[in-house]
Amino acid sequence: MKSYLALLSHVLNQGIDRTDRTGVGTRSIFGYQMRFDLQAGFPLLTTKKLHLRSIIYELLWFLKGDTNIAWLKEHGVSIWDEWADKQGNLGPVYGYQWRSWPAPDGRHIDQIDNLLRMIKEKPDSRRLIVSAWNPALIEEMALPPCHCLFQFYIDEGKLSCQLYQRSADIFLGVPFNIASYALLTMMIAQVSGLKVGDFIHTFGDAHLYSNHFEQAQYQLSRIPNALPCMRINPAVTDLFSFKFEDFELLNYEAHPHIKAPVAI
């Protein structure tokens, strides 16, 4: 995860201090890219321990097309609590756009199902894309999508994924995003009969909140460990049938967790 630490250092040392929607203030850069070889290990940060349970359950929640936090809370995941209304609703966020994008003619488009079909039928297609950025519904969302578009690419039987993230909370959010989309790529590769390739993470506004500077400096003082390995139940051949128990993280040695406040 040296590439992540390089991003952290780059923003701390060369970023521009700016105001932001939350009122906290950020130091940011515009335009940056990282690449992870998924055959070299699972890109889960080792310079601070991450809550993998939350990452996996959130991804399964997205794939369910769910937009209410009740299912997450049933499984001990609270990462969306601050944005939900009293009934637990978040509006038409990620899961809704991925699985039920509303078309002008009244249909609802299942982008994930379409993607899986195209990977098998047209593996050379340049249209292997899923978008969560729906301008018509942004105002109805509790939080507009930060990781808003991803595309797949198949080469010599290997599946790679590139994510475009318009807004990136480097200290808290980005480590989750890396692991989540790496895992999604592995899952789709498995059910499509492919090997994994690279995960490419492309950023628009990549920022550190001003109340994360000390934590970032502390994290940079730590020496990263070898990447762990993610084992996925090979019996699962349907993307929508995965359960939490189908994933096993091996050899994860991480430094202790570093607390930091969430900007709402």
Curated annotation (Swiss-Prot):
Catalytic residues, per the record, are C146
Where is it localised? Cytoplasm
The uppermost taxa in this organism's lineage are: Bacteria, Pseudomonadati, Pseudomonadota, Alphaproteobacteria, Hyphomicrobiales
What this protein is called in its record is Thymidylate synthase
Under catalytic activity, the entry for this protein gives: dUMP + (6R)-5,10-methylene-5,6,7,8-tetrahydrofolate = 7,8-dihydrofolate + dTMP
The record's section on CDD domains has: TS_Pyrimidine_HMase
Report any one BP term from Gene Ontology: dTMP biosynthetic process
KW Phosphoprotein (keyword) present: no
Q: Which GO terms describe its molecular function?
A: thymidylate synthase activity
Question: What pathway is this protein a component of?
Answer: Pyrimidine metabolism; dTTP biosynthesis
Family per similarity comment = Belongs to the thymidylate synthase family. Bacterial-type ThyA subfamily.
- Organism for this UniProt entry: Bartonella tribocorum (strain CIP 105476 / IBS 506)
Which GO terms of the cellular component aspect does the record hold?
A: cytosol
Q: Which InterPro entries match?
A: Thymidate_synth/dCMP_Mease (IPR045097), Thymidate_synth/dCMP_Mease_dom (IPR023451), Thymidate_synth/dCMP_Mease_sf (IPR036926), Thymidylate_synthase (IPR000398)
Q: Does the keyword Cytoplasm apply?
A: yes
**UniProt xrefs under SUPFAM superfamilies:** Thymidylate synthase/dCMP hydroxymethylase
What's its EC?
2.1.1.45
